[in-house]
Amino acid sequence: MKQSLRHQKIIKLVEQSGYLSTEELVAALDVSPQTIRRDLNILAELDLIRRHHGGAASPSSAENSDYVDRKQFFSLQKNNIAQEVAKLIPNGASLFIDIGTTPEAVANALLGHEKLRIVTNNLNAAHLLRQNESFDIVMAGGSLRMDGGIIGEATVNFISQFRLDFGILGISAIDADGSLLDYDYHEVQVKRAIIESSRQTLLVADHSKFTRQAIVRLGELSDVEYLFTGDVPEGIVNYLKEQKTKLVLCNGKVR
């Protein structure tokens, strides 16, 4: 297959899936891993894809994309993460569910539970959770965003009145030094309130968050008890070895 045709196919496959690993591209195009890596490097230099650890993503996945787009990106990985989180939450527990498509996936995975008490600033998650009549769902007040997130000073004040068992926290980016980053200062204030009001904080993040850049600092990975993700750079693995934060991969392994 000519290189130009192969590049077109790679771009199309990545756009359709949001993210594909090197191994998946090798299988789809029937070429060597070395060839795929060279192709990905060329396409990344042209800004036609976004190079990631072990694969490639659509360029738009590196930005704070629209809600519908973000929900589609890495949906399989988000669902796998959500299933692992759900295993840790017992029936009758109390928890916060944060803004974001991965916390929303967790909400969906919890529908088989009973008698959960949930506080959320995620309108989409609340809409899902109301299907279970045994749940006690409380919505935080504040300013409603177009993506269904609720933020603002009123949201922070409301969340700070609670002390719950778990906080399901999303994040926009995780820096190489373990810093937790987001795009919106007001959203970060809400996330801080969730961490402070939770006995255990469960951070949920697909692997693309390790290559994204955001400017507002929330804190450190060491501020949360668990990190649930699909894949993680070796530098973060080494960082977590010095912390109490447990790393849970979407395949269920704990490191």
Swiss-Prot record:
Q: What does this protein do?
A: Repressor of the glycerol-3-phosphate regulon.
Pfam families, alphabetically?
DeoRC (PF00455), HTH_DeoR (PF08220)
Where the record annotates domain HTH deoR-type, the positions are 3-58
Query: GO BP, one example?
Result: regulation of DNA-templated transcription
Per its UniProt record, what InterPro entries does this chain match? Answer: Carb_Metab_HTH_regulators, DeoR-like_C, DeoR_HTH, NagB/RpiA_transferase-like, Tscrpt_reg_HTH_DeoR_CS, WH-like_DNA-bd_sf, WH_DNA-bd_sf
Please tell me the species this chain comes from.
Answer: Haemophilus influenzae (strain ATCC 51907 / DSM 11121 / KW20 / Rd)
Q: Which residues bind DNA?
A: 20-39
Name the chain's protein: Glycerol-3-phosphate regulon repressor
In its UniProt record, a GO molecular function of this protein is: cis-regulatory region sequence-specific DNA binding
